[in-house]
Swiss-Prot record:
The keyword Oxidoreductase does not apply. It is found in: Cytoplasm. GO terms for biological process: bacterial-type flagellum assembly. GO terms for cellular component: cytoplasm. The lineage of its organism: Bacteria, Pseudomonadati, Pseudomonadota, Gammaproteobacteria, Enterobacterales. Its main location: cytoplasm. This is Flagella synthesis protein FlgN. It comes from Proteus mirabilis. The gene is flgN.
């Protein structure tokens, strides 16, 4: 059972490394001048899939740890403790990478919102109200006032 726990920790490490690759690909995409929304959606789906698998693997690790009678950081088992240390270090790295990607995404959203606001403000048709004054309409189509 100790070997199965080691294999589970190895699998978690592999899954975290996969997530690292996905986050780096996401970062490259977010650093590009314009975002390929289809590619971003694909990356998000990949990330969600691996995170779900990681959640299942962690549940298995917790069950095995209880069955063996040891828990993280596995100080009584040097090899397991080393694997756990690698997992903790990689998780911290992924946390920072994910936060950075979140900031990049937020910048894109802000820029797109500002652009949309500018376009709506400056490129909407001008209509005249009953008082003869110009009114801007941000709605598409015709506006009729009676």
């Amino acid at each position: 059972m100790m070997e199965e726990l080691r294999q589970t920790l190895d699998l978690q490490l592999s899954q975290l490394n996969t997530i690292a690759g996905i986050l780096r690909a996401e970062q490259q995409l977010l650093c590009a001048g314009s975002i390929d929304i289809n590619k971003l959606h694909e990356i998000t789906e990949q990330k969600n899939f691996v995170l779900t698998a990681l959640g299942h693997t962690d549940q298995k690790r917790q069950i095995l740890s209880k069955q063996v009678g040891i828990d993280r950081p596995y100080q009584g088992q040097p090899f397991l403790a080393d694997l756990w240390g690698q997992l903790v270090d990689l998780t911290e790295e992924l946390k920072h990478l994910n936060q950075h990607n979140g900031l990049l995404l937020e910048q894109h959203i802000t820029r797109n919102s500002e652009t949309l606001h500018f376009l709506q403000k400056n490129h909407s048709p001008t209509l005249y109200g009953a008082d003869g004054q110009a009114q801007r309409s941000i709605l598409a189509g015709r506006k009729i006032q009676i």
